[in-house]
Amino acid sequence: MKAVILLSGGLDSSTILYQAKADGCECYSISFDYQQRHRRELHSAFLVAQTAGIVQHQVVNFDLRLWGGSALTDDKIDLPQERSVDAMSQNIPVTYVPARNTIFLSFALAYAEAIAAERVYIGVNALDYSGYPDCRPDYIEAMQEVFRLGTKQGREGQPINIVAPLINLKKTAIIQLGNQLGVPWNLTWSCYNGGDVACGVCDSCRLRLAAFAELGLEDPLPYLKGV
C-alpha cells in the first residue's frame, strides 16, 4: 500500500519512515521549507529519505515568517535554553508554531489523495503532546474525521488513515524502536538552532541527548555542548 510520511529529518519522523517501510508500505515522504530557523533539518530529511530508498521525496515551500508567532519563525523570539524536561512540559512552549501540524497534515492529505495513498504517517508522541496541542491523541482523532469527511476517498468509503505509531511512546522508547528498525541516527537532525553543528542546549537537543544518555547510548551527532 502507498503511504505519505511527514518527514522533518528528526529522530521521530525518521523512525516513522522506517516503521512505514517495515509495515510494507510504498513510501512517499514530504518535508516543509517554511523558512524555519532550523532549515538545516531539510538536508537531513533528504539524506534519510535517500538512505531509506523511498519512491519519492517532496519539499513544499511556504513562508510562515509572514506572521511569525513562534521562536522557530520569528528571530525576535528567543529560543529557550538549558531547560529541564519538567520545565518544558509546564506550558505550551514558544517553539510551538501556530497550526503547524494542521498545515502539514493538509498538504500530506492532498498529496496522499493525489497518488491514491491509503495512509499518512506522522511522528507525534507522548513527549510532544505534553506541551503541543496539535500532537495530542484527540487532535489526531479529529483530523482523521477531517480526512474522512473532506476527501473523495473518504466519501467513497475508503478514507486515508492517519498512522501515529509513536503516539504513546517517550523518546527512550522511540530510540529503542529506531535501533530495531535500523534508523541512521547520524543522518538525523533535531536542533532548533541554525548552523551546521547541533547546539546541545535548545529543548529539542536536550530531550534527545537525555534520552540517549538514559539508555546508556552515545548520540552519534556532534554537539557544541552536551548534557
UniProtKB/Swiss-Prot annotation:
Cofactor(s) named in the record: Zn(2+)
CDD domains (alphabetical): QueC-like
Pfam families xrefs: QueC
GO terms (BP aspect): queuosine biosynthetic process
Ligase among keywords: yes
Pathway(s) of this molecule: Purine metabolism; 7-cyano-7-deazaguanine biosynthesis
Cofactor stoichiometry and binding remark: Binds 1 zinc ion per subunit.
Binding residues annotated for Zn(2+), in chain numbering: C191, C199, C202, C205
Assigned keywords, A-Z: ATP-binding, Ligase, Metal-binding, Nucleotide-binding, Queuosine biosynthesis, Zinc
Binding site for ATP: L7, S8, G9, G10, L11, D12, S13, S14, T15, I16, L17
GO molecular function: ATP binding; ligase activity, forming carbon-nitrogen bonds; zinc ion binding
Nuclease among keywords: no
Catalysis performed (reactions): 7-carboxy-7-deazaguanine + NH4(+) + ATP = 7-cyano-7-deazaguanine + ADP + phosphate + H2O + H(+)
Enzyme Commission no: 6.3.4.20
Record function comment: Catalyzes the ATP-dependent conversion of 7-carboxy-7-deazaguanine (CDG) to 7-cyano-7-deazaguanine (preQ(0)).
PANTHER family per record: 7-CYANO-7-DEAZAGUANINE SYNTHASE
NCBIfam families in UniProt: 7-cyano-7-deazaguanine synthase QueC
Similarity-based family: Belongs to the QueC family.
Protein name: 7-cyano-7-deazaguanine synthase
Organism: Trichormus variabilis (strain ATCC 29413 / PCC 7937)
Lineage: Bacteria, Bacillati, Cyanobacteriota, Cyanophyceae, Nostocales
